[in-house]
């Protein structure tokens, strides 16, 4: 009932662990799957090891988180050494980031043996020179996606920033370059200030906002992208309940990524949401989750 097929890859359900603030060891990826995730996305991997920013890197708010982790990762060589020893019985999407199209392509070439698909982090809002600074311009999105598609036969997903006037332009550029899908949204630019210290709370000052507060923004982005593109859209942003998940599916998302809810509530959210979607489908008379994808686009 919940199984979906994306880019020729089978997922037991449309719920995928998002790349983000949860540490991504192989054992934690397995735990996410045991707790109900249909697939996983790794931490974003770059050319060199990065320790990330000094604490504090996360601010908890009533309706989500602001984070500025600084893209901490072991670098591609250490990541490859660790993950090539592992065998996973579920889809593993490897997230990569770089400062140029050539760096993205290099990483895709090197990490192909441990990836079922690649997600291109074109949208991190707080790491200077990476992510959003590249991904805000459609021409840059096109160049990065094309460079990666030229060197790998693995499916390529472009992760898009919401910090633009029209996210559809980014999606269309990714599609034109040959992307197999897009994921949206990454976090929204944000800041939190300590009123007694009279300074920003995060060590980096600025961060990315995620969680329930961004859901309506994310839902609109998914709706717009699904209305405009012929490739699958993976919905991300504030999905916390099964009702949230159903909204994204109706808006045209072919699959969903969940991150902040895992940080706040634990891996059990995957099973809770999957069970809720199943109940909804039965109550509404559907035999497959595929039957409800995009229904709200037809109104």
UniProtKB/Swiss-Prot annotation:
It is found in: Cytoplasm. The keyword Nucleotide-binding does not apply. Pfam families: DHO_dh (PF01180). GO terms for molecular function: dihydroorotate dehydrogenase (NAD+) activity. One of its GO terms (cellular component) is cytoplasm. InterPro entries: Aldolase_TIM, DHOD_1B, Dihydroorotate_DH_1, Dihydroorotate_DH_1_2, Dihydroorotate_DH_cat, Dihydroorotate_DH_CS, Dihydroorotate_DH_I. Pathway: Pyrimidine metabolism; UMP biosynthesis via de novo pathway; orotate from (S)-dihydroorotate (NAD(+) route): step 1/1. Its EC number is 1.3.1.14. Signal peptide: none annotated. The keyword RNA-binding does not apply. Keywords: Cytoplasm, Flavoprotein, FMN, NAD, Oxidoreductase, Pyrimidine biosynthesis. Substrate binds at residues 43, 67-71, 121, 186-187. SUPFAM superfamilies: FMN-linked oxidoreductases (SSF51395). Its cofactor is FMN. Gene3D superfamilies: Aldolase class I. Heterotetramer of 2 PyrK and 2 PyrD type B subunits. This is Dihydroorotate dehydrogenase B (NAD(+)), catalytic subunit. It comes from Pyrococcus abyssi (strain GE5 / Orsay). The gene is pyrD.
């Amino acid at each position: 009932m919940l199984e979906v097929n994306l880019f020729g890859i089978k997922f037991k359900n449309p719920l995928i662990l998002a790349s983000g603030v949860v540490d991504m060891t192989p054992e934690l990826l397995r735990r996410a799957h045991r707790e109900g995730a249909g697939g996983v996305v790794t931490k974003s991997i770059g050319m060199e090891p990065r320790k990330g920013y000094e604490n504090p890197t996360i601010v908890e708010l009533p309706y989500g988180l602001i984070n500025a982790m600084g893209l901490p990762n072991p670098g591609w060589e250490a990541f490859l050494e660790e993950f090539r020893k592992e065998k996973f019985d579920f889809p593993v999407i490897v997230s990569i980031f770089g400062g140029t199209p050539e760096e993205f392509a290099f990483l895709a070439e090197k990490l192909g043996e441990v990836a079922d698909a690649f997600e291109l982090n074109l949208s991190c809002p707080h790491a200077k020179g990476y992510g959003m600074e590249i991904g805000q311009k459609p021409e840059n999105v096109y160049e990065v996606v094309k460079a990666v598609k030229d060197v790998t036969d693995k499916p390529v997903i472009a992760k898009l920033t919401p910090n633009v006037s029209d996210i559809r332009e980014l999606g269309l550029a990714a599609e034109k370059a040959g992307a197999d899908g897009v994921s949206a949204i990454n976090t929204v630019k944000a800041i939190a200030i300590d009123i007694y210290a009279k300074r920003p709370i995060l060590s980096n000052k600025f961060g990315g906002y995620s969680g329930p507060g961004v859901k309506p923004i994310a839902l609109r982005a998914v709706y717009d992208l699904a209305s405009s593109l012929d490739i699958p859209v993976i919905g991300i942003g504030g999905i916390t309940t099964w009702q949230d998940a159903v909204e994204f599916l109706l808006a045209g998302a072919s699959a969903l990524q969940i991150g902040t809810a895992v940080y706040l509530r634990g891996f059990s959210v995957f099973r809770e949401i999957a069970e809720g979607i199943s109940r909804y489908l039965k109550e509404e008379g559907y035999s497959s989750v595929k039957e409800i994808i995009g229904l709200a686009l037809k109104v």
